Regions:
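Single-pass alpha-helical transmembrane signal-anchor segments
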Residues: 1-19
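Long, charge-rich amphipathic alpha-helical coiled-coil "stalk/tentacle" segments
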Residues: 9, 165-180
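Aromatic-capped interface at the extracytoplasmic side
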Residues: 14-30
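Amphipathic, interface-forming alpha-helical segments with heptad-repeat character
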Residues: 22, 30-35, 45, 51-166
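Terminal hydrophobic membrane-targeting helix
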Residues: 40-44
Length: 180
């Protein structure tokens, strides 16, 4: 009798563990015996016990990556620090799961190198005044580069441009003189 109860409980547990409900704005990447099988979208799904495995739960909402200030050098050899924010969305859960080892680190490194390339073509004055142009160029470059990873870059913002202290002091003195 005890063995029958254990078997019934075990069978019920296996049946319940086969039912997976994927919540809104998420997708599950499924592997069968270690190989990619499919991507489950929102709703009710059944998995084969002991054979299918949820490899990754992927958030499909727009996400924000806030990176620490990056040192960059302008065309006129001024070193400044720029703080960036990247708004992105995962468009292909399979590519996101298998496309790159650590997507967040890859986006951070890609953002830093792209920022250095763009700022390296601009002088200090241009960098301080053409924030929108820099944002647009960065978004376009990052979106193309992250496409093979299943990521769409929606927006890039330069949160803060921090010039060197001596240049910042000179700018403050000039603004003070203009006000007087």
């Amino acid at each position: 009798m005890v063995a029958l109860i254990i078997i019934v409980v075990l069978v019920l547990w296996i049946c319940v563990s086969c039912i997976k409900i994927v919540p809104q704005a998420q997708a599950y990447v499924i592997e069968r015996l270690g190989a990619y099988q499919s991507t489950w979208n929102v709703g009710f799904n059944l998995k084969i016990p002991f054979i299918d495995k949820v490899a990754r739960k992927v958030n499909l909402k727009e996400q924000v990556a806030d990176f620490p200030p990056q040192p960059v050098i302008t065309k006129d050899n001024v070193t400044m620090r720029i703080d960036t924010v990247v708004f992105y969305q995962i468009t292909d859960p399979k590519l996101f799961t298998y496309g790159v080892e650590n997507p967040m680190m890859a986006i951070e490194n890609l953002t830093a190198t792209t920022l250095r390339n763009i700022i390296g073509d601009l002088e200090l004055d241009q960098t301080l005044t053409s924030r929108e142009t820099i944002n647009t160029k960065m978004r376009a470059a990052l979106d193309i580069a992250t496409d093979p990873w299943g990521i769409k870059v929606n927006r890039v913002e330069l949160k803060n441009i921090i010039p060197p202290a001596e240049i910042q002091n000179a700018m403050e003195k000039q603004m003070k003189a203009e006000r007087e």
